[in-house]
Amino acid sequence: MNYAILLKTVVDANGTTNSVEKVPMMEVFPTISLESMYKLCECEFVDIKDMPLQLVEFDGELGIIPAVTLVFDEEFLLKNEKPVANELASVIYGYGRLHDQCLCGNVLLCYTNEEGDCMPFSEGEANAIVKCLTKINNHIGDMEFKVQKPMMKFMTF
């Protein structure tokens, strides 16, 4: 069985909780369909970003973020009055190290093959990634996340 990994931020009376789910991919083709991306990210427009292998330090411990492809809602900041950072996805995206942009909403993790198709992970790969993400999530409380304001810049031609 092949899996994509879904990162969610759950907001309730106790605050926010980061959730990591292995999602079985029952696709007819080996790639992850655009329809599946829309459904899992709960949106109509997705953005896709490849992230290289990264080393991050939390509390003096080194953590490894494997090379992954992030699939996320392109318009989340425009559709929500009070967007909440998806902290785990934001760390993978480079928040606090490469830039100050948070990701919000559900974020799908997969990998991209040589043809540029989004592909699910094998069960072993998915388990290893979940283990890495769990370790990083244990230290994520050390960071402060500030969601950027939505901005649109119009350019004249």
Task: Show the residue positions of the predicted features.
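Short beta-rich binding modules
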Residues: M1-F157
